């Protein structure tokens, strides 16, 4: 596991991973900042809790928005990442967003890795690499997401779901 406090019990959704590096957002770090204070035009569309999430330590002044939509069509505000998940352009008018959005989350900053850095951390067992479920991105109780993701796994990794925060006081 990584010693970096930015990633302690973090669930990171990778948005991009290539030979140029990797970029993702932390899904389970809600802030107390209301989305309406940052991007007021999108506030009513955001999933509960309607706060900005801390996406990571890189560029905390930048906002990234992920959405869930079964059929985004050819909306100019949608950049598909998978069948249901995409990046939403917060500079656009929410009325031009694809219909059928069932989840929206705004992140301040992101998590970034230089070429080969994430792979090296994975080789040192610094990360569990697991499949995401679309609902993971939009849970209301994000603080429980780390345990929930691990608990649904098969095999030894599942045991970490009940691992104490500080094993030395166990």
Question: Residue spans of the language-model regions?
Answer:
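A short aromatic-anchored loop/beta-hairpin motif
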Residues: 1-170
């Amino acid at each position: 596991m990584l010693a970096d406090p930015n990633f302690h019990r973090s669930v990171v959704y990778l948005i991009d991973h290539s030979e140029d590096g990797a970029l993702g957002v932390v899904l389970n770090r809600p802030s107390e900042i209301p989305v309406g204070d940052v991007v007021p035009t999108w506030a009513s569309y955001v999933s509960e809790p309607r706060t900005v999430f801390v996406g990571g330590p890189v560029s905390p002044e930048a906002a990234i928005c992920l959405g869930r939509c079964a059929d985004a069509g050819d909306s100019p505000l949608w950049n598909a990442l998978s069948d249901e998940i995409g990046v939403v352009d917060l500079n656009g008018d929410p009325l031009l967003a694809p219909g059928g959005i069932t989840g929206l989350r705004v992140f301040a900053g992101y998590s970034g890795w230089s070429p080969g850095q994430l792979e090296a951390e994975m080789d040192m067992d610094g990360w569990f690499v697991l499949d995401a479920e679309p609902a993971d991105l939009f849970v209301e109780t994000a603080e429980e997401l780390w345990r929930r993701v691990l608990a649904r796994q098969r095999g030894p990794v599942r045991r970490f779901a009940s691992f104490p925060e500080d094993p030395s006081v166990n």
